[in-house]
A protein has these predicted regions:
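Glycine- and aromatic-enriched mobile tails/lids
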Residues: 1-6, 15, 23, 37-39, ...
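N-terminal Rossmann-like FAD-binding beta1-loop-alpha1 element of flavoenzymes
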Residues: 8-32
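Glycine-rich active-site loop/strand segments that organize a redox cofactor
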Residues: 52-85
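Short beta-strand to alpha-helix junction loop
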Residues: 77-90, 129-148, 158, 212-220, ...
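Conserved redox-cofactor binding core of oxidoreductases
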Residues: 97-189, 194, 201, 242-249, ...
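Glycine-rich loop(s) and the adjacent beta-strand/alpha-helix scaffold that form part
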Residues: 197-251, 304, 396-413
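An anion/pyrophosphate-binding glycine-rich loop and adjacent beta-alpha core
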Residues: 225, 231-347, 413-419, 454, ...
Length: 584
């Protein structure tokens, strides 16, 4: 067992983690722990762009962007955070440009911009060109650019170090972050990282769904680590289902395709979004478009022999436009479906895409232990966090913006905290939980298989907690997850070795997914309304009287060791925009 000491430790090396690292390393001795090589992080899969009211192509301003973000989040957005996001967006894009990111350009040389769902001119009058993009590889370009700048700044990376536990020490009645415990995949060794400040930037939770755009590594590791230590998770019932995933595979086809003029059609060739969103049409918010697609399918207007998908039609767009603006998704259509997008429409269906909920933070990235209390030395940014800038539904291109704006803020805040803070004493036997977990799983002779339990979890979530939900479907999910959690106690793995034990890694990840899926389902069951990505067919309307509030879920352990979930609620921060009916 090895012990390391740093001023700041960052968990995760995607966009938020590396943006934080660039700022933190300038101000404090920083280590970045990542279970992947940094450029394999899921930020690289983001395609469409990064929102900022640059007004390079059309009139725009940050206040319109703020309004669209609040409206898009179905008014569950904390508006102070939304204002910061929109105001700082312009500098965030220009910072990346200065770092070397190759944005697409207008003929006069400025950063080009295109339309994206839910982004509008003058508070909803018409779509606006706000998305700054690098073809349909924007996330990839951001990831590469940030990594190059991390290397330039001398950031210390610990690659393939899997953080399994958050260390909390109580000092004078105040719970403080003391560091993290990590498992080194190459050797099987346990490492303790003592740090004055810890930033979680470990990404989302989407692998508890089967049809998902998320990478295999998005298993909620950061959320699970802090949740086990008694800290809350916020708004976990809100999960975004992107309208255009490749049929049956879930691989993302960017919203930028519709921003460039792509059209959604049913089996009759009808542009059906005109019925559901007369102004924004195919560029309505993602929750609206995904529900519209499933409504078409349910009412018998789906495409194909089984009527289980619709079409994304790009055939009316010039091939040179597709090649220049959408090279990756046209290649995806050819590779995965054998379809030529120049001449044939692409079969699509909604895919689980993004967690709006996560570890609750304030606008500086400081983690909260309840509605207002900060955990000294603990920070989070990106999809792992809930600031809450996305509310009940995230707008496209606000994610790449979020990781840059709040990743930067968390990096600065954590480093500055480390200047004045002392190291917190480590708990007695700090690696006890991780050693017990690793050895129990590695030496288990149980009969349950990780792959079987994971498949049953994913099928349960797809069937019961996806775009449309009811009391009965959510209860079915809660009961099935409880059964799977019980069976997980008898899980066995084949590989008993220490080095690169991927069987062990997958077993640990499954445990995280089971914990978080239960939180999501229990939170969804309690929210008896429809709002954004959470749609209850038995409660189809938004209820601002009873549910204009954030859900806070806490893990509680009884004297007999039984676990339960306690739900509490936190008020929404409203500054200038009062809730209205959402129309697109």
């Amino acid at each position: 067992m090895k012990i390391h000491k740093y001023d700041t430790v960052i968990v995760g090396a995607g966009g938020a983690g590396m943006r934080a690292a660039i700022e933190s390393t300038k101000r404090s001795r920083t280590a970045v722990l990542t279970k992947l090589y940094p450029t394999r992080s899921h930020t690289g899969a983001a395609q469409g762009g990064m929102a900022a009211a640059l007004a390079n192509v059309e009139e725009d301003n940050w206040e319109w962007h703020t309004f669209d973000t609040v409206k898009g989040g179905d008014y569950l957005v904390d508006q102070d955070a939304a204002e910061i996001l929109a105001k700082e967006a312009i500098d965030a894009v220009l910072d990346l440009e200065k770092m070397g990111l190759p944005f697409n350009r207008t003929p006069n040389g400025t950063i080009d911009q295109r339309r994206f769902g839910g982004h509008s001119r003058n508070h909803g009058e018409a779509p606006v060109r706000r998305s700054c993009y690098a073809a349909d590889r924007t996330g990839h370009m951001i990831l590469q650019t940030l990594y190059q700048n991390c290397v330039k700044e001398g950031v210390e990376f610990f690659n393939e170090f899997y953080v399994l536990d958050q260390l909390i020490t109580e000092v004078d009645g105040v719970k403080k972050s003391a560091g993290v415990v990590a498992y080194e995949l190459a050797t099987g060794e346990i490492h303790i990282f003592q740090a004055k400040a810890v930033i979680y930037a470990s990404g989302g939770t989407g692998k508890f769904f089967k049809v998902t755009s998320n990478a295999h590594t998005l298993t909620g590791d950061g959320q699970a680590a802090v949740y086990r230590r008694g800290l809350p998770l916020e708004d976990m019932e809100f999960f975004q289902f992107h309208p255009t995933g490749i049929w049956r595979m879930g691989i993302l086809l960017t919203e930028g395709a519709r921003g460039e003029g792509g059209i959604l059609r049913n089996k009759d060739g009808e542009r059906f979004m005109e019925k559901y969103a007369p102004v924004m049409k195919d560029l309505a918010s993602r929750d609206v478009v995904s529900r519209s697609i499933y409504t078409e399918i349910r009412e018998g207007r789906g495409c194909g022999p089984e009527g289980d998908h619709v079409y994304l039609d790009l055939t009316h767009l010039p091939p040179e436009q597709l090649d220049a603006k959408l090279p990756d998704i046209t290649e995806f259509a050819r590779t995965y479906l054998g379809i030529e997008p120049y001449t044939d429409p692409i079969p699509i269906q909604p895919t689980a895409h993004y967690a709006m909920g996560g570890i609750p933070t304030n606008v500086e990235g400081e983690v909260l232990s309840d509605n207002t209390t900060v955990v000294p030395g603990l920070y989070a940014a990106g999809e792992v966090a809930c600031v809450s800038v996305h509310g009940a539904n995230r707008l496209g291109t606000n994610s790449l913006l979020d990781i840059n704006v709040f990743g930067r803020r968390a990096g600065i805040a954590a480093a500055e905290y480390s200047h004045t803070a002392d190291y917190v004493e480590l708990p007695e036997n700090p690696a006890e939980f991780v050693v017990e977990q690793v050895e129990r799983l590695r030496n288990s002779t149980g009969t349950e298989r990780v792959s079987v339990l994971r498949r049953e979890l994913q099928e349960t979530m797809d069937a019961n907690v996806m775009v449309f939900r009811t009391e009965q479907t959510i209860k079915t999910a809660v009961e099935k997850i409880a059964e799977l959690r019980e069976r997980y106690k008898n899980v066995g793995i084949q590989d008993k070795g220490r080095r690169f034990n991927t069987d062990l890694l997958e077993a640990i990840e499954l445990g995280n997914l089971l914990d978080l899926a239960e939180v999501m389902a229990v939170s969804a069951l309690a929210r008896k309304e429809s709002r954004g990505g959470h749609y209850r067919e038995d409660y189809p309307n938004r209820d601002d009287v009873n549910f204009m509030r954030h859900t806070m879920a806490y893990r509680e352990v009884g004297d007999d060791g039984t676990e339960s979930i306690r739900l509490d609620y936190k008020p929404v921060v409203q500054t200038r925009y009062q809730p209205m009916e959402r129309k697109y």
